[in-house]
């Protein structure tokens, strides 16, 4: 849910007191303790949870997910009426009880403002909101987030994260692709203006039709990379290098090539 909030003349949440105000708001409204750290232009919110994972099924607990959603909505309300100079919001919802699972959500804050003004669809907003899951046993018993590291997220890093996020969604939600491939692992680095992303695509089947034989995962990832670069009209990179570590195929694209690609991806998101 995207919360719409119209700020008045002055900031309701001044930069100096905004973290304390948001912490108190979440405590009062949701009876939940959060811990905020601002690193550069990135605001991190650590949310210790005992109800993020259902112990019987080892799946997500709806109560915990709903709590994270409400905390993010509260953060949106505050961010839309603060004079703090922020580019990114990063929320870590952590199971501190048993499993040590963390759900990470990263948002580029100008996207939030454009979503409020309906400059793109709700579905596009959620595709721009990066989600990731990781396992970290040091989270168990960590009620303040002291075991975690907090960095100032760069826009190059966010671009890499969003390409990976969109690729994961595509290869899970598109029936044809999910039947053929599993995206097992991903990684990224940035060097000399080139974004280097690695994807490990495992084949699920080898009894392929002639049409299926021609399908290459990186052909889709290439379009995703172009879509992200075009969406932001991003100009501060030399290009991208995409590698499928399973097939050992690599595609290198300059910024000019990325901007000229006609994006024709499956429309499962609409």
Each model region followed by its residue ranges:
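Post-signal peptide N-terminal segment of mature Sec-exported envelope proteins
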Residues: 18-38
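Extracytoplasmic/secreted envelope proteins and their assembly/folding machinery
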Residues: 19, 23, 65-76, 218, ...
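Polar/charged, Gly/Pro-rich intrinsically disordered segments
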Residues: 39, 44-46, 50-55, 81-270
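Mid-chain, structured segments of secreted extracytoplasmic proteins
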Residues: 56-92
């Amino acid at each position: 849910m995207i919360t719409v909030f119209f700020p008045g003349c002055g900031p309701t949440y001044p930069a100096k007191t905004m973290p304390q105000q948001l912490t108190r708001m979440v405590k009062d409204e949701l009876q939940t303790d959060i811990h905020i750290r601002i690193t550069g232009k990135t605001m991190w919110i650590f949310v210790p949870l005992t109800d993020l994972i259902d112990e019987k099924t080892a799946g997500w607990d709806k109560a915990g997910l709903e709590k994270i959603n409400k905390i993010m909505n509260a953060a949106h309300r505050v961010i839309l009426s603060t004079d703090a100079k922020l580019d990114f919001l990063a929320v870590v919802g952590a199971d501190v009880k048993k499993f040590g699972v963390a759900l990470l959500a990263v948002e580029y804050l100008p996207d939030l403002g454009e979503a409020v003004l309906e400059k793109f669809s709700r579905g596009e907003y959620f595709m721009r909101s990066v989600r990731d899951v990781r396992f970290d046993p040091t989270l168990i018993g960590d009620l303040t987030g002291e075991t975690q590291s907090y960095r100032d997220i760069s826009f190059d890093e966010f671009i890499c994260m969003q390409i990976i996020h969109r690729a994961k969604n595509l290869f899970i939600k598109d029936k044809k692709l999910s039947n053929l491939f599993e995206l097992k692992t991903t990684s990224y680095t940035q060097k000399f203006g080139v974004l280097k992303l690695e994807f490990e695509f495992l084949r699920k089947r080898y009894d392929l039709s002639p049409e299926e034989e021609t399908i290459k995962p990186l052909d889709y990832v290439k379009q995703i990379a172009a879509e992200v670069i075009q969406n932001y009209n991003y100009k501060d990179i030399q290009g991208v290098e995409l590698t499928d570590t399973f097939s050992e195929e690599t595609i290198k694209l300059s910024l000019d090539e990325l901007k000229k690609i006609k994006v024709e991806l499956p429309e499962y998101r609409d």
